[in-house]
């Protein structure tokens, strides 16, 4: 990821401060009316956007580092899990809960989106929900596969329908 910043001429070491300011700017602009921001990274004169979003824009923050989890707890409306070892998920969720408590944000609504092999069965989704997961991220193609996607759309739709019938339709509402 550092090379992405190098290509753009952006300092990798300011990425945390940069996203903090970007979130403040997004929330300020989405609130309606004129907004200005004078931070260490960005300096915006009094500006506004139109039309203003009809509802608050949910901000989901990803990452497994303590800095990312603290940022999600402090500034986010939710957290995006980046995948990995399923056995590590409870510890990540516990760290996130601790950061939310420390930030005083544990009483507000908060989404937890998780990539997990448990997302593909009814019992697995229930196990995730029992851990505080609100949403699962599912895919039917390995996300890190490089090269062209040659699977026909009809096959993708078949997989999606099968998932809807075997998992989504069987969730308690």
PLM features per residue range, with description:
Residues 1-173:
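Active-site-adjacent structural elements that line small-molecule/cofactor binding pockets in enzymes
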């Amino acid at each position: 990821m550092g090379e992405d910043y190098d290509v753009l001429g952006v300092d990798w070491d300011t990425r945390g401060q940069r996203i903090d300011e970007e979130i403040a700017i997004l929330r300020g602009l989405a609130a309606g009316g004129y907004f200005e921001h004078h931070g260490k990274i960005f300096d915006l004169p009094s500006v506004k956007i139109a039309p203003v979003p009809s509802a608050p824009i949910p901000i989901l923050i990803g990452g497994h580092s303590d800095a990312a989890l603290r940022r999600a707890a402090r500034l986010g409306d939710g957290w995006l899990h980046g995948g990995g070892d399923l056995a590590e998920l409870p510890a990540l969720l516990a760290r996130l809960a601790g950061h939310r408590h420390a930030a005083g944000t544990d009483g507000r609504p908060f989404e937890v989106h998780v990539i997990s092999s448990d997302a593909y069965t009814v019992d697995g989704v229930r196990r995730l929900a029992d851990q505080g997961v609100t949403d699962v991220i599912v895919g039917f193609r390995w996300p890190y596969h490089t090269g062209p996607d040659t699977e026909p759309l009809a096959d993708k739709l078949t997989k999606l329908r099968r998932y809807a019938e075997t998992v989504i339709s069987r969730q308690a509402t």
